[in-house]
Amino acid sequence: MSTPGAQEVLFRTGIAAVNSTNHLRVYFQDSHGSIRESLYESGWANGTAKNVIAKAKLGTPLAATSKELKNIRVYSLTEDNVLQEAAYDSGSGWYNGALAGAKFTVAPYSRIGSVFLAGTNALQLRIYAQKTDNTIQEYMWNGDGWKEGTNLGVALPGTGIGVTCWRYTDYDGPSIRVWFQTDNLKLVQRAYDPHTGWFKELTTIFDKAPPRCAIAATNFNPGKSSIYMRIYFVNSDNTIWQVCWDHGQGYHDKRTITPVIQGSEIAIISWEGPELRLYFQNGTYVSAISEWSWARHGSQLGRRALPPAE
């Protein structure tokens, strides 16, 4: 059975999440096309019609990034498939960001990935989306207007896009990793490091995934040329799978995590510990967003249904 609150959540909604340690924000689309925010501050709240931050085309992809929740950016598509930005800055609240004014039109089936560049106090952003020629395009904000960045090459039409960013303690700039799916259904990585720029090679992390499966990624504990990454995707068994990158081991440990509805979107956040929180739809109240939690003592389902579902 559903609940009145769950019925407000779009089935197969885009999902995005940001955090500052265990202060959490989750974004989703309601059945009328509005983007809402649910939050966790020692308890779950919001997610109602009073917590709308933007309006987007129905079925829009969602991506979000933040700097300690002082600056939050949430990305979606307009009815005309133009990239748009809902922006929050502490002290000024929510407003429409400058991105829509740049008029970057993407493929109607594009997904979105987004990151603030790590290791700098400056507000520098990178967005990844799929153009109508099916290439993955980077869009950059360095404080002086939105511009096109590097083109990462052709991907499967409608591919999921995962992205994460950190700064190694011994590097003088940010590192970026982007994951997407190729026409042969492999899940692949493109890598950027400050001393090399974008690596030309594609690194395969999974040989065959369902076409257009959702992809999400996070990292934790950046150190001296060392990083820990977790990449998630929805596999053909309708469960979320996790692929681990651990320092000294590379990619290893590919396993199923938790069941979801077919075609569920996913979002992942992490913080020191490490602590991981994964958001998805698994059929609870039909369309509620649910949470999976990982900490040192093990993994379990977290909140069964985020507000407004219950």
UniProtKB/Swiss-Prot annotation:
Beta-L-fucose 6 binds at W44, R277, E291. Beta-L-fucose 2 binds at R73, E85, W146. This is Fucose-specific lectin. Has six binding sites that are non-equivalent, and owing to minor differences in amino-acid composition they exhibit a marked difference in specific ligand recognition. It comes from the Eukaryota. InterPro entries: Fungal_lectin. Beta-L-fucose 3 binds at R126, E138, W198. One of its GO terms (molecular function) is carbohydrate binding. It comes from Aspergillus oryzae. Induction: Expressed in iron-deficient culture, but repressed in presence of iron. Contains two GGATA sequences at -470 and -193 bp, consensus DNA-binding sites of GATA family transcription factor sreA which regulates siderophore biosynthetic genes and other genes involved in iron homeostasis. Lectin that specifically binds to L-fucose and weakly reacts with mannose and N-acetyl-neuraminic acid. Has strongest preference for the alpha-1,6-fucosylated chain (core fucose) on glycoproteins among alpha-1,2-, alpha-1,3-, alpha-1,4-, and alpha-1,6-fucosylated chains. Binds to fucose residues of IgE in mice and human, causing antigen-independent IgE-mediated mast cell activation and anaphylactoid reactions in mice and is possibly implicated in allergic response to Aspergillus oryzae in humans. Beta-L-fucose 1 binds at R25, E37, W94. Belongs to the fungal fucose-specific lectin family.
